Amino acid sequence: MLPSAVAAHAGAYWDVVASSALLNLPAAPGFGNLGKSFLIENLLRVGGAPTPRLQPPAPHDPATALATAGAQLRPLPASPVPLKLCPAAEQVSPAGAPYGTRWAFQVLSPSADSARLPGRAPGDRDCTFQPSAPAPSKPFLLSTPPFYSACCGGSCRRPASSTAFPREESMLPLLTQDSNSKARRGILRRAVFSEDQRKALEKMFQKQKYISKTDRKKLAINLGLKESQVKIWFQNRRMKWRNSKEKEVLSNRCIQEVGLQEDPLSRSALGFPSPCPSIWDVPQQHSSPRWRENSPEPSERLIQESSGAPPPEANSLQGALYLCSEEEAGSKGVLTGAV
């Protein structure tokens, strides 16, 4: 058999072994079932000019040709050489799980395969492909090699880590009664004072509306209270005292305004009797048309005021008072005669 024919048969054998191994292997990230890559970079490479394969130069000397053919000839192994899919570069995620970005096939010798897999014989054909086993200590979701980084040229997002969606055990517990009680410790409860304490506090408040720090400390020690309780009591008491003072001032103003706007008849109802009704009938006389006829004109009023003569209104008032005094004297005489 010629050396070229032997080399051709050997190359065909290696192609069959590699294709059979690839058919049994799961598809690598970015590769289809037929072993073709659908990544953008690989598609661009395929669409461009194919890279020429390096072929050894044709030997002109028959001796050199036999030497090269003998060097290319290798003994065929009894079992196919196993292939291993391993990541060429790994990236460590925040959670500690490796992300494989680049994948490459490594040809392992039967001795290395048997050394790594002591439980199986090197001639076992089922062991043609043995992927690297994930670490048992890491979670399952994080130990499996994610294909998101290699897919679509690395544009796909990586799966969310365990910290983004925590498990039920890591979630914070709901608010309980203990947490509520701890949160409410800072809120001061309303103090309940006894009668003696109230009397002592009220007595001190009547002396001074604003208590000093030393007096407050002494008063708290004597009454068995805290300084904060005494301070808050004085603040509330001063607020009540201010409100009561404001109410008193407003009530006094209202009484004064009502007193100024009272009618003469309401004065008699309040205890101011009017024995002479003619005095209060004077405004009615002013409104009568007869009084308007008898009343002088404004020019005549000015003349009377300049001359010093009393106005007719004063004369009418004096006459009414004189009549009232005569009536009172007559009523008194009648009462004395009856007695």
Swiss-Prot record:
Organism: Homo sapiens (Human)
GO molecular function, one term: DNA binding
Stated name of the protein: Homeobox protein DBX2
Domain of life: Eukaryota
Location in or out of the cell: Nucleus
Skewed-composition ranges (Basic and acidic residues): 290-303
Gene Ontology biological-process entries: epidermal growth factor receptor signaling pathway; G2/M transition of mitotic cell cycle; gene expression; neural precursor cell proliferation; regulation of transcription by RNA polymerase II
TM region positions: none
InterPro entries xrefs: H2.0_Homeobox_NeuralPatt, HD, HD_metazoa, Homeobox_CS, Homeodomain-like_sf, HTH_motif
Single GO cellular component term: nucleus
Family per similarity comment: Belongs to the H2.0 homeobox family.
Location of the DNA-binding region in this protein: 186-245
UniProt region (Disordered), positions on chain: 282-318
